[in-house]
Each structure stands twice: as C-alpha cells, then as structure tokens.
C-alpha cells in the first residue's frame, strides 16, 4: 500500500504539537468542574442559553483524510507506548484534538434529567458535539471508558470519540452518574443499566437542540464503547432496539468490555490481581450505591485505602493511573480484607448477588455489530468476550468477532478506535 507523504508530515506535526503540550502540561490546570449554570439545559431546552451559530460549513477534509490513513495512528500508537500511556500525554492529545476541532464544531456541555433503573430522577450532564454543516448522517452515541477524575468527564474535556464528528455525525456522550454535574454522587461503576439510561435519556433530549439550529438528520444511531463503555454500548443498543421505535440502530461497536461483572470479580480474586488497582473498590462502592446496599467500607478495604478512600477515589480528583501510583499494588489481598474477597460472608454475598444482575450476556443485536478484544488484554480479562461470544453465537452474519493478540488494553484501544473510525461512512 502506498503511503501518502503528506499524511506522514501531518502526522509528525500533530505528534510534535502533542509533545509540546505534554511538556507544558505541568504548567496548566485541568478543569475539574463547571458551575451548574455553565451547562446548557436540554430538558426543557433553554434556548436563551444557546450560542448563536452562524457558520454552515467547516472544512473537515484534512483531518478526516489524516485519520482515514494509517500513518498518524501508527505514530500515535508508538508514541503513546513510549510515554507509557501517561495521563499527561493522553490529556495533551485531547488538547491537540480540541484545538483542531475548535473552529470547526460546536461543542455543548449540557444538563438533562434522567430516570435511573431504581426510578430516581437525577440531573445529569454530558456533551453534544456538532459539525457546522446542517446535514447530519446520524448520531454516534459514544460511551466512555473508566475514568477516575472529574476532569476526564466528556463535558469537561475533548474526548477522543469527538473525531467521529469529522465523518458528518453528531457525537453525543453522557458523563454517567457521578461525574460532571453529578460529581457529588458515587459513580455506580460497571452498572451498565444506569449508564445506558443516562445515555439514552441524553439522546432523547437532543432532537429539540438539533431542531433549534436547523439540523436535518436521519433517525439513525451508532452505538460505540470501549472498556467500561462496551457493555454500556450493548445496553444502549438493547434499549433502542426494544423500546425506541422512532430510532434506528445501524451499527454497534463494542471493545474489550467487562460483560460479565461477577465473573470478572471472581477472576480478579482467584488471581489476586487487578489491572486497574482501584477498579474492584470502585465496583464495590458503586454497586452499593446503584443497588442501595449500604455496604460499609470497613468490611471490604484495608488501610491505607480504608482511611483514604474518600480522598483518593470519591473526591474525583485523581485519575485511575494516579490512584494506582498511590496504592502501589495490583494485588487485591493488599487492599481488600479477607471478608471482602470471600463470597460466603454475608455482606460480600449481598454485593455478589447484585453483581450477577449486572451482566449483559445473551443479548443478540439486530444491526451490524463489531465486537473486539485483545487476547493479551492486561486490564479486562479476555474471558469476558469469550463468554459474550458463547452467549450470542448465532448464524447472524451481521456480527463480527475480532479477537486476536493486539497487545495491552491501552494499545488495543487505539487499534479499536482506528478500526471503527475508518469503517464508519
């Protein structure tokens, strides 16, 4: 295959810009939150708060052509690996992307009401990213991966998934409960029903916004998610196909997800290891919040995590990488109590029973579906995707399983995003 020299040059310039931003990152301050009034209310739509949009055109072609080729992805993949997928480098990529899209798109942090699985009505937040051209190809519902700090929430940064706007789609992303405007709440981690409701409720609030600006669009949805976002993307697809006849789900892309949460917990306990050190603690307290179990940290955590959980995790000040650096251990036996790792204990049994309600095995999508997982994943056990495949194996030719040794969880994420971007028309 011929490599376009211009793509290599542009890719090198892009990475140089990222390097400069990464070097300067320690001198910049991330936005941890917005005031409630900074979010544009979508339900009901606050038209007075909406910015005036005069532009009707934006030249996305250079960036689209760059991302449609392989050179920039190869450069980014190698450079990310060299920087050990550091928070600073990832944020510098987001800052570079934001600069490239700033004058070509309308990015709106927004608030809306969502009805959660337990019936609670919450004020949540997310982001809607629009190209200036008023003719959309559809809407990409992008479900974000595991985050720890509030400044990583989609409404407070420029998420990687915003690149789909260069293909002519609106990109819609929910922050999930516990981030953005609801950062004071505990995030119900890996409770896909909560995140799927948050995402679909945001989708339902978008048509009035698009009508206000005069956008035309088919009622077609692409559901996308990686890592924590993968089971959410499947859940979103299920909700749309089963309960929203006015919307058509055209494609589903899910990568490296913890589809069977109870099994994932068992796997981590059995191996006394977890790829993201704070993941199981977040899962315990998130499940407690989502299912109103009122679990006590003393039954599950050892010091120093027990003493500092509120500061390190619940404050949403630190990324998962920063929390990992604080904990200095990937062994569950060093952060959790014996009781918390024993399903025969009453409180752990209550937690585990709730986990068994949080898997999404068995749902068979009816749209074009691409399921991806690296067999070498170091964060989300590959057995999750094996179980998902076994649970939905049919003669349905619309489902593609792409399971191969694509490297670590983070390395495979770049490959997945590239594959999806280059596949979407």
Task: Pin down the residues of each PLM region.
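N-terminal targeting or regulatory segments adjacent to alpha/beta-hydrolase or S9 domains
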Residues: 5-6, 14, 20-105
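N-terminal cap/lid segment of alpha/beta-hydrolase-fold proteins
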Residues: 90-133, 138
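Short substrate-entry loop that stabilizes the transition state in hydrolases
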Residues: 134-137, 145-172, 177-183
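Alpha/beta-hydrolase active-site loop
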Residues: 189-211
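Primarily recognizes the serine-hydrolase "nucleophile elbow" in alpha/beta-hydrolase
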Residues: 204-275
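Accessory cap/linker subdomain of secreted extracellular hydrolases
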Residues: 255-362
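C-terminal catalytic histidine-bearing segment of alpha/beta-hydrolase fold enzymes
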Residues: 266, 347-354, 379, 383-425
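Short beta-strand/loop motif that positions the catalytic acidic residue
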Residues: 370-377
């Amino acid at each position: 295959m011929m490599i376009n020299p211009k793509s290599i040059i542009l890719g090198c310039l892009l990475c140089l810009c990222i390097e400069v931003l990464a070097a300067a990152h320690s001198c910049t301050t991330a936005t941890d939150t917005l005031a409630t009034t900074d979010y544009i209310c979508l339900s009901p739509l606050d038209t007075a708060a909406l910015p005036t949009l005069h532009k009707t055109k934006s030249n996305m072609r250079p960036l689209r052509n760059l991302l449609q080729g392989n050179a920039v992805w190869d450069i980014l993949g190698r450079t990310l690996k060299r920087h050990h997928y550091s928070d600073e480098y990832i944020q510098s990529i987001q800052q570079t992307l934001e600069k490239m899209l700033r004058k070509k798109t309308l990015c709106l942090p927004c608030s809306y009401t969502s009805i959660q699985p337990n019936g609670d009505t919450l004020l949540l937040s997310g982001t809607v990213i629009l190209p200036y051209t008023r003719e959309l190809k559809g809407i990409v519902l992008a479900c974000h991966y595991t985050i720890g700090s509030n400044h990583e929430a989609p409404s407070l940064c420029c998420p990687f998934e915003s690149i789909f706007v260069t293909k002519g789609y609106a990109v819609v992303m929910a922050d999930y409960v516990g981030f953005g405007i609801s950062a004071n709440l505990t995030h119900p981690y890996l409770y896909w029903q909560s995140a799927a409701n948050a995402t679909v409720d945001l989708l339902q609030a978008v048509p009035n916004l698009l009508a206000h600006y005069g956008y035309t669009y088919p009622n077609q949805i692409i559901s996308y998610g990686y890592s924590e976002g993968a089971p959410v993307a499947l859940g979103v697809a299920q909700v749309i196909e089963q309960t929203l006849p006015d919307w058509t789900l055209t494609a589903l892309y899910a990568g490296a997800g913890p589809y069977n949460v109870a099994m994932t917990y068992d796997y981590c306990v059995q191996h006394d290891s977890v790829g993201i050190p704070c993941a199981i603690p977040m899962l315990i307290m998130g499940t407690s919040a989502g299912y109103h179990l009122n679990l006590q940290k003393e039954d599950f955590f050892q010091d120093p995590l027990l003493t500092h959980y509120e500061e390190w995790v619940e404050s949403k000040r630190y990324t998962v990488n920063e929390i990992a650096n604080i904990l200095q251990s990937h062994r569950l036996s060093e952060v959790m109590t014996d009781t918390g790792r024993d399903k025969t204990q009453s409180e752990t049994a209550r937690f585990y029973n709730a986990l068994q309600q949080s898997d999404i095995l068995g749902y068979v999508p009816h749209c074009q579906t691409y399921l991806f997982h690296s067999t070498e994943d170091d964060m989300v056990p590959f057995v999750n995707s094996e179980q998902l495949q076994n649970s939905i194996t049919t003669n349905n030719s619309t489902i593609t399983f792409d399971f191969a040794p694509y490297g670590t969880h983070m390395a495979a994420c770049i490959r997945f995003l590239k594959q999806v971007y280059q596949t979407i028309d």
